[in-house]
A protein has these predicted regions:
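N-terminal chloroplast transit peptides
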Residues: 1-43
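N-terminal organelle-targeting presequences
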Residues: 30-75, 80, 84-89, 95-106, ...
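Catalytic alpha/beta core domains of metabolic enzymes, predominantly
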Residues: 216, 221-338
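Alpha-helix-loop-beta-strand connector modules within alpha/beta enzyme cores
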Residues: 118, 140-143, 148-149, 179, ...
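Active-site beta->alpha loop and helix N-cap motifs at the rims of alpha/beta catalytic domains
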Residues: 79, 95-100, 104-199
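Conserved, mostly hydrophobic/aromatic
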Residues: 94, 157, 193, 208, ...
Length: 397
């Protein structure tokens, strides 16, 4: 299935976002039912195209066809030049995207950045910091507007990670970005805003969602983050499966991780399962996204989750693996509202999450991984400002 403006998510997926830390090639991410044969280096924004199934083109059923009947598959990245082959339906704009655009002067989006740096409104800012913040906001939105012209679905905009522990500033930043989008005639229903899953970020999500502004919570590494974000009404919650697994291989002492290991479960996959069951058992509206997928079995083990961000190497393997017709239904939908209804939660897990309970429940894994993610995003934002400082004013000013 493809995401559309009528879905509860169209992201950058949703994705960043840069989701993965790889080389330096400017790229974009797609969610599709077909896989592109490119060797890619870095993910910048996510684009979600609607591509034909191999069933229609070859008459064969592949593993990819089978898994996409249960979950939205979000391939890692493809280059900008493939818009015509794989028309995107949704996208994300982020600091990493701005860095990539500035590294390629000939890209179609460079004009959007140059126009932001030429904006007279920013020149009148009271301080150099305010002026730079204005430039970055304008650049994000200008690129987002260009992307909105290319996609029928939603454009997700990353909120500065340096605001992660300040609810009011997160809300103000989103309002500022939303105002700029409105001035350029992009309606709120076309937008998502990506916010780190700190307690303050979750509170910002609660306030924004109450205004009808959709949020995408990222860096969720523990059940308390997921449950609190779901209670806040976040539209999308993203879990990084592989990063939790990596942490567990090299660390110990996290009660949540240790409990899953004692049950013989992978901590990342276990969190996705628990999060999905909680959301569906208790009627929350949030959609769940699984990222940092490391192998095909990861995909098979969480079929039924709303979105799975999957590296192209794995997707290519899924596409190249033909499934005989009599095996089509051997792929089991592991997650479903029906199975969620039978899942049991402890009394402690069913609390109305407040800041005290939230911070008490955050274990070493979630604290360390959240901190690392925030530092990475903050570094990208700082690099954008430094780069803008070097290239401002642009040649046409």
């Amino acid at each position: 299935m493809a995401l559309s403006s009528s879905s509860s998510l169209a992201i950058s997926s949703l994705t960043a976002p840069a989701f993965l830390d790889r080389g330096s090639k400017l790229t974009v991410q797609f969610a599709t039912s077909n896989v592109v044969s490119f060797k890619l280096k870095r993910s910048f924004p996510l684009f979600i195209p609607s591509a034909g199934s191999s069933v229609h083109t070859t008459g064969l059923i592949t593993e990819l066809d089978s898994v996409t009947s249960y979950s939205e598959i979000v391939p890692d990245t493809v280059i900008f030049d493939d818009f015509q082959r794989f028309p995107p339906t949704a996208a994300t704009v982020s600091s990493s995207l701005l860095l990539g655009i500035c590294s390629l002067p000939d890209t179609a989006f460079r004009g959007a950045v140059d126009n932001a740096l030429s904006d007279r409104e920013c020149y009148d800012s009271e301080s150099s910091d305010a002026r730079m913040s204005c430039f970055v906001n304008k650049a994000l939105v200008n690129v987002g507007v260009d992307l909105a012209k290319l996609v029928p679905g939603r454009v997700s905009t990353e909120v500065d990670a340096r605001l992660a522990y300040d609810t009011n500033r997160i809300v103000k930043k989103v309002h500022d970005l939303l105002k700029l989008y409105s001035e350029l005639e992009v309606p709120p229903e076309r937008l998502l805003f990506k916010i780190p899953s700190t307690w303050q970020g979750i509170e910002a999500s609660r306030l924004l969602e109450s205004e009808g502004i959709r949020t995408h919570m990222t860096f969720a590494y523990s059940f308390c983050q997921v449950a609190a974000a779901a209670q806040a009404g976040a539209s999308v919650i993203q879990i990084f499966v592989g990063r939790l697994r990596d942490w567990a291989r090299n660390h110990s002492g996290d009660p949540e991780v240790e409990a899953s290991l004692q049950r013989g479960e992978d901590p990342g996959l276990a969190l996705v399962t628990k999060a999905y069951n909680y959301i569906h058992k208790y009627g929350h509206k949030s959609k769940l996204m699984a990222a940092a997928i490391r192998n095909k079995q990861d995909v098979f083990n969480i079929l039924g989750v709303d979105y799975i961000i999957t590296p192209l190497k794995i997707l290519q393997s899924l596409q190249e693996s033909v499934t005989p017709p009599d095996e089509k239904y051997s792929y089991v939908k592991r997650l479903s509202p029906q199975s969620a209804s039978a899942y049991s939660f402890s009394k402690e897990e069913l609390v109305k999450w407040d800041q005290y309970n939230f911070e008490s429940a955050m274990g070493p894994a979630s604290v360390e991984l959240l901190t690392a993610g925030l530092e990475g995003y903050a570094d990208q934002a700082k690099r954008v400002e430094e780069l803008f400082g070097k290239i401002w004013p642009p040649p046409n000013v």
